Every structure is written in C-alpha cells, then in structure tokens.
Amino acid sequence: MTKIKLCGIKSEDDIKVINEVLPDYIGFVFAGKSKRYISFDTANTLKSKLDSRVKAVGVFVNEDIENIAHLVKNRIIDIVQLHGNEDESYINTLKAKISVPMIYAYQIKSKTDIKSVKNDTEFILLDAGAGCGETFDEALLEGFDNEYFLAGGLSIDNIKEKIMKLHPFGVDVSSGIETEGKKDAAKIRKFVSLVREVDNDR
C-alpha cells in the first residue's frame, strides 16, 4: 500500500478532514520562510486533536537540534523530516538525542543528485525543490531502486499515473491539495481516494 503524507497542515479545519480520511502522515512545517509555517504552540494544539492513527511529521530546514528534540520529547511530532542542507554530523548528533524515525529530503535536478542519495535516515524523500510544486524528470529515477517518498507537483490530476509508473513507497503532497493557498477539503478527499484506488486495482 502506498503511504500517504499530506503536508503543510495549519488549521483545525484541516485536522477535521485529516481525521476523516486518515492518511498515514501529516506534515507540520517549521521552516520560518515557508508560507505554510506554523509555530510550535499551534502544532501542539493541532496534534492534540489529531487521530492517533495518523503520524505527525515535523518538517525542518537547518533547525536547532534542541528545538527538534523538544518537539519529539513532548510528542508534538512523531517523525522528523530534514529539508535543508543538514550534514552527516548534524544527523548523527540528532540521532543521539531522539528515538523517532527521520526522513531526509533530496532535491532532484540531475543524475548527480540521485547518485548523492544516502541511507543515513529511515526514509528518504525525493523532491523537485522545497515547496515549489514542480515535478522532476522521471528519467532520472532509472535504475534507482531505494524506497522513497515522491514529492513535487503531485495533484489529483496526475497522482494515479505517477504511482503506476514509479511505484514509490509513499507520496507527499501540499500545494496539490490547496486552492488559493489554503487546504481544500474536497481535493484532500479526492487525492487520498485516488491513491487508495490505485492500490486496490493492483
């Protein structure tokens, strides 16, 4: 079954729909420059209302390790996603402080980027660029057999095709389930339904 991650969750209205469709993961974005940024306090409130079957992923860009450890310790997030240029030393230091899975996001623009992918974390995510809403050249994935989350430019218009062609471990969507910058309940329901439809047909 293809795992589903809905990223950029910001409001209690979003959580209500999430609890209805029950994706595997949601993403709280803690990168200050992102238009989907939320504070730690807001994330705490939203997590308290989230169905326990859905795991909350904290998305960070070069964040202070102590802040991440605080969020994990207080169970505001269940998984850590690193979306900056965090190096091996950073990852090892973070691993020593937390005991939850990590996702490392790679921006894929060339074959060289694919070759640079490492397995230093439990999961990897392949994206065209943080929050850009664009897809990357699928030909770059030829011969790549690691499990990964597919992100970048996914929507209700292309998700079935992407899953059938690329067979990712999971899919990660944000802008593709939004209308005018806000999460769209109808698009969320449709996206989740389409992913599960593909899985049921295989």
Where are these regions (language model features)?
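Conserved N-terminal beta1-alpha1 strand-loop-helix module at the mouth
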Residues: M1-L126, G131-R202
